[in-house]
Amino acid sequence: MSDIVWAAMQNVGAPEWGQEAVNVAREIQSSLGMEPMTAPFLEDCSQLRSPQEAEAILRQDLPPSQTNSTSDDYTDMTWHTPTARFYVARPALKPAPKGPYPSWVMNALGGIPATIDPMVTTAAKILSVSALRLLQDKVARDRVMAEFKTRTGGGIGGKTWMAPLCDYAPPLDFKWPEYVETPRGRQF
Protein backbone atom coordinates (compact mmCIF):
# COMPACT_ATOMS: atom_id res chain seq x y z
CA MET A 1 0.00 0.00 0.00
CA SER A 2 2.81 2.39 0.83
CA ASP A 3 4.28 1.80 -2.64
CA ILE A 4 0.96 2.87 -4.21
CA VAL A 5 0.75 6.01 -2.08
CA TRP A 6 4.43 6.80 -2.68
CA ALA A 7 3.88 6.53 -6.45
CA ALA A 8 0.90 8.89 -6.09
CA MET A 9 3.02 11.34 -4.09
CA GLN A 10 5.69 11.31 -6.77
CA ASN A 11 3.02 11.86 -9.42
CA VAL A 12 1.32 14.74 -7.56
CA GLY A 13 4.44 16.32 -6.07
CA ALA A 14 4.97 18.26 -2.86
CA PRO A 15 2.94 21.34 -1.93
CA GLU A 16 3.98 24.57 -3.58
CA TRP A 17 3.27 27.89 -1.94
CA GLY A 18 2.57 30.73 -4.35
CA GLN A 19 3.42 34.41 -4.14
CA GLU A 20 0.35 35.22 -2.03
CA ALA A 21 1.48 32.68 0.60
CA VAL A 22 5.02 34.06 0.49
CA ASN A 23 3.63 37.57 1.01
CA VAL A 24 1.61 36.38 4.03
CA ALA A 25 4.69 34.71 5.53
CA ARG A 26 6.83 37.78 4.93
CA GLU A 27 4.14 39.98 6.50
CA ILE A 28 4.16 37.75 9.59
CA GLN A 29 7.94 37.99 9.82
CA SER A 30 7.79 41.77 9.42
CA SER A 31 5.12 42.05 12.14
CA LEU A 32 7.54 40.28 14.49
CA GLY A 33 10.24 42.85 13.82
CA MET A 34 12.22 40.53 11.54
CA GLU A 35 13.70 41.28 8.18
CA PRO A 36 11.32 39.34 5.87
CA MET A 37 13.04 36.43 4.12
CA THR A 38 12.95 36.15 0.34
CA ALA A 39 11.94 32.48 0.64
CA PRO A 40 10.34 32.22 4.11
CA PHE A 41 9.11 28.59 4.04
CA LEU A 42 11.23 25.63 5.13
CA GLU A 43 12.64 23.81 2.11
CA ASP A 44 11.57 20.48 3.67
CA CYS A 45 7.92 21.52 3.25
CA SER A 46 8.31 21.33 -0.53
CA GLN A 47 10.28 18.08 -0.71
CA LEU A 48 9.15 14.48 -0.91
CA ARG A 49 10.61 11.72 1.24
CA SER A 50 10.21 8.02 0.50
CA PRO A 51 8.27 6.00 3.08
CA GLN A 52 11.49 4.30 4.17
CA GLU A 53 13.33 7.60 4.64
CA ALA A 54 10.39 9.17 6.50
CA GLU A 55 10.07 6.10 8.75
CA ALA A 56 13.79 6.20 9.57
CA ILE A 57 13.53 9.87 10.57
CA LEU A 58 10.42 9.19 12.67
CA ARG A 59 12.07 6.24 14.43
CA GLN A 60 15.06 8.35 15.52
CA ASP A 61 12.90 9.70 18.35
CA LEU A 62 11.19 6.43 19.32
CA PRO A 63 12.49 3.76 21.69
CA PRO A 64 13.34 0.56 19.77
CA SER A 65 10.58 -1.35 21.57
CA GLN A 66 7.84 1.03 20.37
CA THR A 67 5.98 -0.42 17.40
CA ASN A 68 3.74 2.51 16.43
CA SER A 69 4.59 6.18 16.39
CA THR A 70 1.27 7.37 17.79
CA SER A 71 -1.90 6.12 19.41
CA ASP A 72 -4.40 7.48 16.94
CA ASP A 73 -7.05 6.12 14.61
CA TYR A 74 -4.46 5.27 11.98
CA THR A 75 -2.80 2.55 14.05
CA ASP A 76 -6.23 1.13 14.93
CA MET A 77 -7.39 1.09 11.31
CA THR A 78 -4.34 -0.84 10.09
CA TRP A 79 -5.87 -3.93 11.70
CA HIS A 80 -9.11 -3.65 9.73
CA THR A 81 -8.12 -2.61 6.24
CA PRO A 82 -5.00 -2.19 4.14
CA THR A 83 -3.67 1.23 5.08
CA ALA A 84 -0.78 3.55 4.35
CA ARG A 85 0.16 6.62 6.33
CA PHE A 86 1.61 9.61 4.54
CA TYR A 87 2.41 13.12 5.60
CA VAL A 88 2.04 16.32 3.63
CA ALA A 89 3.81 19.30 5.15
CA ARG A 90 1.79 22.10 6.59
CA PRO A 91 3.29 25.53 6.01
CA ALA A 92 6.23 26.21 8.31
CA LEU A 93 8.64 29.11 8.30
CA LYS A 94 12.41 28.94 8.29
CA PRO A 95 13.88 29.48 11.76
CA ALA A 96 13.77 33.00 13.10
CA PRO A 97 17.23 34.48 13.75
CA LYS A 98 16.51 35.31 17.42
CA GLY A 99 14.71 32.19 18.62
CA PRO A 100 11.44 30.41 17.89
CA TYR A 101 8.36 32.02 16.44
CA PRO A 102 5.41 32.58 18.79
CA SER A 103 2.88 29.72 18.68
CA TRP A 104 0.28 31.91 16.97
CA VAL A 105 2.39 31.88 13.79
CA MET A 106 1.83 28.16 13.18
CA ASN A 107 -1.87 28.54 13.95
CA ALA A 108 -2.19 31.52 11.63
CA LEU A 109 -0.43 29.72 8.76
CA GLY A 110 -2.85 26.82 9.26
CA GLY A 111 -5.89 29.07 8.94
CA ILE A 112 -5.06 31.35 6.03
CA PRO A 113 -6.25 29.91 2.69
CA ALA A 114 -3.15 31.01 0.77
CA THR A 115 -0.88 29.13 3.19
CA ILE A 116 -2.96 26.05 4.12
CA ASP A 117 -4.78 25.29 0.86
CA PRO A 118 -1.65 24.02 -0.97
CA MET A 119 -1.20 21.38 1.76
CA VAL A 120 -4.86 20.32 1.78
CA THR A 121 -5.07 20.25 -2.02
CA THR A 122 -1.88 18.20 -2.31
CA ALA A 123 -3.11 15.67 0.28
CA ALA A 124 -6.48 15.39 -1.48
CA LYS A 125 -4.78 14.75 -4.82
CA ILE A 126 -2.56 12.04 -3.31
CA LEU A 127 -5.57 10.32 -1.73
CA SER A 128 -7.52 10.54 -5.00
CA VAL A 129 -4.71 9.20 -7.18
CA SER A 130 -4.10 6.34 -4.71
CA ALA A 131 -7.79 5.43 -4.56
CA LEU A 132 -8.14 5.51 -8.35
CA ARG A 133 -5.12 3.23 -8.71
CA LEU A 134 -6.69 0.71 -6.34
CA LEU A 135 -10.05 0.89 -8.10
CA GLN A 136 -8.51 0.40 -11.55
CA ASP A 137 -5.64 -2.01 -10.85
CA LYS A 138 -6.65 -5.52 -9.74
CA VAL A 139 -3.02 -6.64 -9.42
CA ALA A 140 -2.34 -3.74 -7.03
CA ARG A 141 -5.49 -4.58 -5.02
CA ASP A 142 -4.47 -8.22 -4.80
CA ARG A 143 -0.94 -7.29 -3.64
CA VAL A 144 -2.33 -4.95 -0.99
CA MET A 145 -4.74 -7.60 0.32
CA ALA A 146 -2.01 -10.26 0.33
CA GLU A 147 0.21 -7.98 2.44
CA PHE A 148 -2.73 -7.28 4.80
CA LYS A 149 -3.44 -11.00 5.21
CA THR A 150 0.23 -11.73 5.86
CA ARG A 151 0.49 -8.97 8.45
CA THR A 152 -2.71 -9.99 10.25
CA GLY A 153 -2.22 -13.75 9.99
CA GLY A 154 -5.13 -14.22 7.61
CA GLY A 155 -7.00 -10.92 7.54
CA ILE A 156 -9.71 -9.87 9.97
CA GLY A 157 -9.87 -12.55 12.67
CA GLY A 158 -6.46 -13.95 11.63
CA LYS A 159 -3.82 -15.37 13.97
CA THR A 160 -2.01 -12.06 14.58
CA TRP A 161 -5.00 -9.77 14.00
CA MET A 162 -5.89 -7.42 16.85
CA ALA A 163 -9.55 -6.88 17.69
CA PRO A 164 -10.76 -3.27 17.91
CA LEU A 165 -12.12 -3.64 21.44
CA CYS A 166 -10.65 -4.93 24.67
CA ASP A 167 -10.82 -8.67 25.26
CA TYR A 168 -12.09 -8.04 28.80
CA ALA A 169 -15.09 -6.34 30.35
CA PRO A 170 -14.67 -2.56 30.28
CA PRO A 171 -14.19 -0.88 33.68
CA LEU A 172 -17.46 1.04 33.82
CA ASP A 173 -17.85 1.19 37.60
CA PHE A 174 -15.53 4.13 38.26
CA LYS A 175 -17.08 7.03 40.13
CA TRP A 176 -17.54 10.31 38.34
CA PRO A 177 -14.84 12.71 39.56
CA GLU A 178 -15.85 15.30 42.13
CA TYR A 179 -14.18 18.62 41.54
CA VAL A 180 -13.05 20.52 44.64
CA GLU A 181 -11.19 23.74 45.26
CA THR A 182 -7.83 23.27 47.01
CA PRO A 183 -5.02 25.71 47.83
CA ARG A 184 -3.40 24.49 44.57
CA GLY A 185 -6.53 25.18 42.53
CA ARG A 186 -9.39 23.10 41.21
CA GLN A 187 -8.81 19.33 41.34
CA PHE A 188 -10.78 16.11 41.43
Feature locations, PLM:
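Metal-dependent amide/peptide-bond hydrolase catalytic core
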Residues: 1-188
